[in-house]
């Protein structure tokens, strides 16, 4: 869990940030004669739904800190802490117990035994793509999105 937002007041909602950067990348490709810049989503990707949404919004890669920390082979043995946590005079993160859910292969490829988004990330991506009619990730990255605003309670 990162406390950067609370500590230094810097944060953009991840979906908005990914979509804005992907759009800026498209503009840059036009201006630079086709030079492609990778978009890597990092932060708040704790479940397969967030992973799928990041790709749908245009990310080329997704950092999966907490999900990978849940694998039984992970060195933290069910504990996760982001690199932002380490700072000499201004720590901004917390060591978090995320637990273990199974081997890395199960985290990535399943099977899932609960509908909590903690395992089978690739299966979730395949299901989302099939449900929306996409057969490849490149086109899925450009799918239309509808944002439904809500207020947290």
List the predicted regions and their residue ranges.
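Gly-rich Lys/Arg/Thr-decorated short loops/hinges at beta-loop-alpha junctions or inter-strand turns
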Residues: 1-6
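Alpha/beta catalytic cores of nucleotide-metabolism and tRNA/nucleoside-modifying enzymes
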Residues: 8-41, 46-153
